[in-house]
Every structure is written in C-alpha cells, then in structure tokens.
Amino acid sequence: HSFHKLYPGIVIEVLQGTYDDVVYWIKNGVVDMGFLSASSAGDLSIVPLYKDPLLCVMPQNMERHGDGEYIGIDEMKTYPFVAQRESTDADIQNFLKGSALDVHAKYHVVDDLAMVSMVAHGFGICIMPEMVMKDIPYEVKCYPIKPEAYRIVGLATQNSEFMAPAVSTMYQYIIEHYKQKDEVDV
C-alpha cells in the first residue's frame, strides 16, 4: 500500500503459489521477483529478509506430555501429526529430516488453513512458520521448538543486476522497508 502511494504509476500483480511455483515463475519470466524460503531458491539470486521461527501447533485442549514454554523433539514424537505434502514447505521437511522426527502422518494437506483447522479439531499437531500463524482464525496453542528451528524468507530474482527500472524500484523498496533489522544470513 505504501509503495503504491509513492509510485502510483507502477502496476503490481501478485500471484500466490508453492515454492516450486514461484521458482518456476521467476525462471520463466512470469514474475520479476518473488518471496521464497532461502532453502528453496536454488540458483536464483535471493536477499534474506526475515528469520521466521517454526512453531509446534497443538489443539487448544490437548494435554501436553511435557511442560514449559517450549516443545522438544522427543515430546513431538509422542503426538499424531498432520503434515504438509513434501513439495509444500521445504523448511519443515528439512527440519523433520534433520531432527530425525519420523512423522507417520495419517493426514497430508497442502493448504495452511486446512492444516491448522485439522489441528484445531484434534487430528494431531503440526509445524508451521510463525509468520503464517499470526492471523490464523483457529483456537490453537503454538510453542517454540527446541532446538530452535526457523526458515529464512527472502526476495528472489533471476538476476538482481538486470531489472527493468520499475522492478528495480520495487525491489529496492522491499529490501529497504521489510528487511529484518537484525542481520539475517542464509
């Protein structure tokens, strides 16, 4: 909204898709830039913007086997899981593999809202990025994960040096206004 006020002559079209969709769109010139997880960017140029913690999401009324404000891998292993399809969120899949958290989910979904709705209705727990959970309309509990798990969200382009002037203007605006104040490294 603030960009449009400063540059009313620049028309912006927003597309939503999976990480794979966004990579494909950038590489094939469908879009000029896109927001991606750094782990999904492949050979695209990416500027890290935000370190987004992963959270364990539980039904509001589920009794925990552990206690405290955090949840560990060993405790997560004791609950049923609602999982995203592998192509949906690479960071969560990488976390599961890296933590030896062998998830035998009975439910596999693509949509974030559908997954959190299933958790809210008692089908199990899930792992979601904090940014996704900020405006979720379901009553669930969210716990930070120990050891810390996160994704790095960045602004990806085919080549940040060769952009149309309007694209370059928006690219620089996003970096200047939305990059997390703390250093975010890939």
Each language-model region and where it sits:
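Hydrophobic residues within well-ordered alpha-helices
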Residues: I26-K27, M76, S117-F123, L155
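A ligand-binding cleft/hinge motif common to bilobed small-molecule-binding domains
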Residues: V31, S37-L44, D112-V140
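Flexible hinge/capping segments at coil-to-helix
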Residues: L44-F81, P165
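Short beta-strand->loop
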Residues: S45-L55, C126, E130, Y138-I152
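A late-sequence structural motif
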Residues: Q60, C142-V184
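Secondary-structure junction motif
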Residues: H65-G66, I71, Y79-L101, M163-Y171, ...
